[in-house]
């Protein structure tokens, strides 16, 4: 019997488990909620984008999505290291961050996140462009989330760190572990109840502002090379359970395909789908294209929940200049919709949104925007 290469590294538990697991597809998948979270995970807390110009980027997103500025940390607040802005609409919170020149940074100062490394930030932007750096999850105890997740194989990035909020007299505790690629999973706890990250200067919303009706993050989708290995890693460190799954047979076309699994926390308010490319189609999988353009795994898209999608769409179209919508489908597509989902919408409403069937008997109206940056999120 031949011997293995002495330099071969043993397979991790996650890799071994991934090799054993098989996708069954949407039709054969049976959803069960085992309430398996390994620590108390509540909801999405915030999403942080790393960008080259936080000032112009937050203004674009704020205008295009109807999300007013809720807090800032920049030179006007005494932060000489970086500019960072928080937008909020209901429970939906986006943070946009970019460093100032490292040569101008002053020691001490009012930087809520003094650990932010400008070199690492610019390397991230060079590779990924405008993209999501952190997916923040609200947890009961950030230190406990760190202890349990790292004990179960999470690759630590930032140990539990306390950020004081002078305005409210409260404090926030957060920590970070690797999620996929250069994206981190950020656990957020503590007594601070404001939006985003503590230590920022709160901003009052414009008088009479009602926004566009966006109220929370529905799900955050990642693209990876190996779906099962990634899913097993996420399940192992958090205890998340499988909420849904789709194979190329379910959601692919003759041109392009993908496999996808959706993970959820106990309450199923945190939904985190993960996609991988499939091969053998006429065209390259859109997931493979993303992985190439993003120079590796990353967060592909964010789904934003609204209680009135028609109001939101009309407001976004009226604002213009923020986001472009994907082209409408053909007339033949809309003509067939009533026989698929009934007459819950009028013919005019069918043309205003696109409808997708996520599961049998489960239909949701969607309207897709073009990417926020070429080839990225």
Kindly give the residue locations of the regions a language model identified.
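Glyoxalase I/VOC metalloenzyme domain signal
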Residues: 2-71, 78-159, 168-243, 254-377
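Short, solvent-exposed loop/turn elements at beta->coil junctions and helix N-caps
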Residues: 74-76, 164, 247-252
């Amino acid at each position: 019997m031949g011997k293995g290469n002495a330099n071969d590294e043993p397979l991790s538990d996650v890799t071994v488990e991934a090799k054993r697991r098989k996708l069954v597809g949407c039709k054969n998948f049976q959803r069960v909620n085992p309430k398996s979270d390994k620590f108390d995970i509540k909801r999405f807390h915030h999403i942080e984008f790393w960008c080259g110009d936080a000032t112009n980027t937050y203004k674009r997103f704020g205008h295009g999505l109807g999300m007013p500025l809720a807090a800032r940390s920049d030179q006007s607040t005494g932060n000489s290291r970086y500019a960072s802005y928080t937008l909020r609409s209901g429970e939906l919170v986006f943070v946009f961050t970019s460093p100032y020149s490292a040569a101008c940074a002053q020691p001490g100062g009012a930087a809520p996140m003094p650990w932010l490394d400008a070199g690492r930030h610019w390397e991230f932007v060079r590779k990924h462009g405008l993209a999501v750096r952190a997916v923040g999850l609200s947890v009961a105890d950030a230190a406990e989330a760190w202890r349990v997740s790292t004990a179960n194989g999470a690759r630590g990035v930032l140990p539990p760190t306390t950020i004081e909020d002078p305005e409210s007299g409260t404090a926030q505790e957060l920590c970070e572990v690797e999620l996929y690629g250069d994206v981190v999973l950020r656990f957020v706890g503590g007594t601070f109840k404001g939006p985003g990250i503590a230590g920022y200067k709160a901003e009052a919303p414009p008088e009479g502002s009602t926004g566009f009706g966006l109220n929370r993050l529905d799900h955050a989708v990642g693209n990876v090379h190996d779906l099962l290995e990634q899913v097993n890693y996420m399940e192992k460190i958090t205890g998340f359970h499988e909420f849904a799954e789709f194979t190329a047979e379910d959601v692919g076309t003759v041109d392009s395909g993908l496999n996808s699994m959706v993970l959820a926390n106990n309450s199923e308010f945190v939904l985190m789908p993960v996609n991988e490319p499939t091969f053998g189609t006429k065209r390259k999988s859109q997931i493979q294209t993303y992985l190439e353009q993003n120079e590796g795994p990353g967060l592909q898209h964010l789904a934003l929940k609204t209680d009135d999608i028609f109001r939101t769409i009309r407001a976004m179209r009226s604002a213009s200049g923020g986001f472009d919508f994907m082209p409408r489908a053909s007339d033949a597509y809309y003509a067939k919709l009533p026989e698929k989902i009934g007459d819950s919408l009028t013919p005019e409403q069918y043309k205003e949104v696109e409808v997708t069937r996520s599961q049998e008997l489960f239909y949701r109206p969607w309207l897709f925007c073009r990417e926020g940056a070429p080839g990225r999120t």
